[in-house]
């Protein structure tokens, strides 16, 4: 097999822009957070590089999420509740929304992603008055449980009863989703579900990023 130090610049010679998709191994937190695969492409390709998904961030998806909220929000600073992801949290903080993260204890995100968000361990309390509910599951971050699943409690599933606590909130998920584990059929198939337009906005977010990168080549 060709070494990355040769393979990456060879790939760079074939194109103008490179999109890289890589994943966390959940064996070594420091290694995952260094984003070694993505960083090697940035360092050695000689081309503009964008992340299609990486160990700690999924920027095109979270950009699409932001576009979706901007399209559907009815107030300047909506309440957005992320319930039991790093990039989504970054964008919500950057947008200065009323952002709440709710999850079981032990699933705290890395501090740089929490930002100014309010962390609420009581999911029902967090959902009160929400305008958008973004469901996502993730593994533990803190040592010694990094990468582990600590809670399999179905009580965290987003269902109609919990959505009734909100201010007629829209439901969001990046897809694919495990139905009736993350969210019930009733919620994801409801008129307030934005999962399809949210997915469609992935095309828009990618187009915006690629356009900016290609303009920079001129």
What is the predicted role of each segment?
Residues 112-186:
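Rossmann-like adenosine-cofactor binding region
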Residues 1-70, 179:
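Phosphate/diphosphate ligand-binding glycine-rich loop within oxidoreductases
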């Amino acid at each position: 097999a060709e070494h990355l130090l040769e393979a990456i610049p060879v790939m760079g010679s074939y194109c103008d822009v490179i999109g890289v998709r890589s994943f966390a191994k959940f064996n070594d937190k420091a290694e995952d957070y260094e984003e070694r695969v993505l960083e090697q492409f940035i360092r050695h390709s000689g081309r503009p590089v964008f992340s299609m998904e990486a160990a700690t961030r999924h920027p095109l998806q979270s950009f699409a999420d932001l576009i979706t909220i901007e399209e559907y929000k009815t107030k300047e600073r909506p309440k957005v509740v992320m319930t039991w992801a790093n990039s989504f949290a970054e964008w919500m903080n950057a947008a200065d929304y009323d952002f709440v993260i709710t999850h079981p204890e032990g699933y705290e995100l890395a501090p740089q992603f929490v930002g100014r968000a309010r962390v609420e361990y009581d999911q029902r309390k967090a959902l009160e008055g929400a305008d958008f509910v973004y469901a996502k599951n993730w593994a533990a971050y803190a040592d010694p449980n990094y990468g582990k699943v600590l809670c399999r409690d179905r009580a965290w599933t987003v269902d109609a009863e919990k959505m009734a606590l909100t201010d007629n909130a829209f439901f969001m998920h990046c897809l694919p989703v495990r139905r009736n584990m993350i969210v019930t059929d009733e919620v994801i198939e409801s008129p307030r579900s934005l999962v399809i337009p949210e997915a469609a906005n992935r095309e828009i977010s990618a187009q915006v990023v690629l356009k900016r990168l290609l303009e920079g080549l001129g």
